[in-house]
Regions:
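Sec-dependent N-terminal signal peptides
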Residues: 4-13
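A metal-dependent hydrolase metal-coordination microenvironment
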Residues: 23-161, 165, 200-208, 330
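Short glycine-enriched loops at secondary-structure junctions
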Residues: 111-115, 168-171, 222-223
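Residues that line or immediately flank small-molecule/substrate-binding pockets and catalytic motifs
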Residues: 8, 73-74, 198, 246
């Protein structure tokens, strides 16, 4: 009776989502011919150690306005096996795929390759057959690391993309630690990316991604519904932005291999300058309003992501009062400007620091915005 009750609740939750079809919208501008898609590449269901049915992951992704998800259930860790006897590790993807197609969500087949630390856990996304990874698992000790390299090599044989999950997990003092095995995997090019944020942000891991030319991820690793995680994060989103040529699985995988991603965690962006700068520059608009000899500067956020802004400077001949402010999505903030040196046709630019946009662990993005 208990099992039936739980599954019924999960089914009702899914029906509720379908009935409402209501989402929290988070939009970014197109940049340099790329669409900015929103993805979560690390999720679980009841087919490993999660607590929701695969279709719920898709319905929830729609409500959260995600474009891409990867259900990456464990091969090695299946605590619900007695209740959900399943020998096909592709099953969670197969169940979710028709619903994903219906909602317009890009669902990428994936698996989490799970070993004790070192070396830890790795996601292989874009796989062809999850069942092929079971042969590398020690049935007597499912966290045994001896088959790890072979499993990652199998992922690459299948054309998958491999990234390192939550590097601090199960390490001494819960800190990111670089072990000799990680150097070996890096040198063999078996790791292509890393989660700089998963429940928390780690600046050391962000630096690794920059140093080793890895793709940058921020994922939820959600096991239950997303609601408890959002409560911990105070409602702020954790996801990976993907700069894709178009809205297809092929374009997403191509973007991951070309490292065109940005991590979004608790309303902060972490990424390479060439990726975050055009997103910000195409989101912020500035104009000067003049009336009866008075000057009023208005800065507007054209999209949904909030920016913490510090005005570092304005063109010579002008002074500005309000220099630090939060610019929420769809909002505009105005401030008085004093003109010191009269010009017939003023050409003005703002120099801005984005205090919640990082291009290195210690450096915020700085841009120049023209004033119309």
């Amino acid at each position: 009776m208990k099992k039936v009750f739980i599954l019924t609740l999960l089914g009702l939750a899914g029906l509720t989502l379908q009935a409402q079809n209501k989402k929290t919208v988070l939009r970014f501008p197109e940049v340099n011919g790329y669409q900015v898609l929103k993805g979560d590449f690390h999720q679980h269901t009841v087919f490993s150690d999660g607590s929701v049915w695969p279709t719920y992951r898709v319905e929830e992704a729609y409500v959260e306005d995600l474009d891409i998800i990867a259900i990456s259930d464990h091969i090695e860790y299946i605590p619900k096996k007695a209740d959900i006897p399943n020998t096909d590790f592709n099953r969670s993807y197969e169940i979710a795929k028709p619903i994903a197609d219906r909602y317009g969500i890009i669902l990428i087949p994936a698996v989490e390759i799970t070993r004790r630390m070192p070396p830890g856990h790795f996601n292989a996304i874009g796989i062809k057959d999850a069942n092929a990874f079971e042969q590398f698992v020690n049935k007597e000790d499912r966290s045994d690391t001896t088959g790890l390299t072979a499993a990652l090599e199998e992922a690459h044989r299948q054309g998958a993309f491999v990234f390192w999950n939550h590097p601090p997990f199960q390490t001494p003092e819960n800190k990111p630690t670089w072990f000799p095995i990680h150097e070996e995997l890096k040198n063999k090019k078996l790791i292509q990316g890393v989660e700089v944020a998963n429940g928390r942000y780690d600046k050391e891991v962000f630096q690794w991604a920059l140093d080793y030319d890895w793709t940058i991820f921020s994922n939820t690793d959600v096991h239950t519904t997303i609601t408890p995680r959002k409560a911990v994060d105070k409602g702020k989103t954790s996801l990976t932005l993907v700069l894709a040529k178009d809205r297809t699985e092929e374009s997403v995988m191509e973007a991951l291999r070309d490292r065109r991603t940005v991590a979004l965690f608790q309303n902060v962006l972490y990424g390479r300058k060439e990726h975050v700068e055009p997103i910000v520059a195409n989101s912020i608009n500035a104009k000067m309003i003049t009336l009866n000899g008075n000057y009023f500067l208005e800065v507007e956020n054209l999209y949904h992501f909030p920016y913490e802004i510090e005005i570092l400077g304005i063109s010579e001949g002008y002074k500005i009062r309000n220099r630090t402010f939060t610019l929420n999505g769809g909002e505009a903030i105005g401030t008085t400007v004093t003109r010191e040196k009269p010009k017939s046709e003023p050409v003005i630019a703002l120099r801005l620091k984005l205090k919640n946009v990082y291009i290195t662990p210690e450096q915020n993005l700085e841009i120049e915005v023209p004033v119309r």
